[in-house]
Amino acid sequence: MKKLVLIFIFLISCTSNSSNETIAAPVMELTYQNLDGEFVSEDLTNKETIIVFWADYWGICRQELPVLEANLDNLLKNYDVIALAHSDLDSTNYWVNNNLNGILQIGISTNEIRDEYKVIGQPLTIILNTDGEVIFREYGYIPNKDF
């Protein structure tokens, strides 16, 4: 039974599910734990916001984050961008320090954030409009050309 559950979770996290529907109540502020272990809040009303939910133990996420970081200059013209890890603080810090350039805003997601955005696997990319509404969500790897 455990194997079936693990296989189910794996399959869900590998599928692409793109949708442009607005879901959940608008969120105007995002509070998460930064890599220093402090809780910080981000105002989500300045620009549309891209949030990438990822995990340092998941191979596809480890592939996607450097791609996201490589496209950050272009993305920041129109979006605020944050990547929220579903991993513990120490392992996330270790992976980020050894694999990224330090320009991508990284944090640790909380259960409240994951519930708010109905995160059931990763990677998950969502885009919020300036009213805090989800206007795009896609599970799975997003290739370089699509960022």
Model-identified regions with their sequence ranges:
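Sec-dependent signal peptide recognition
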Residues: 1-7
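C-terminal motif of bacterial Sec signal peptides marking the signal peptidase cleavage site
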Residues: 11-13
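N-terminal "domain-start" segment that seeds a small globular fold
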Residues: 15-42
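Short, small/polar residue-rich loop motifs at catalytic or cofactor-binding pockets
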Residues: 26, 47, 120-122
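Short active-site neighborhood of thiol/selenol oxidoreductases, capturing the structured segment around
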Residues: 40-62
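Structural microenvironment flanking redox-active thiols in thiol-disulfide oxidoreductases
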Residues: 62-99, 109-115
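Short, internal strand/loop/helix patches
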Residues: 97-131
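Non-catalytic, surface beta->alpha helical segment in thiol-disulfide oxidoreductase systems
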Residues: 121-126, 130-147
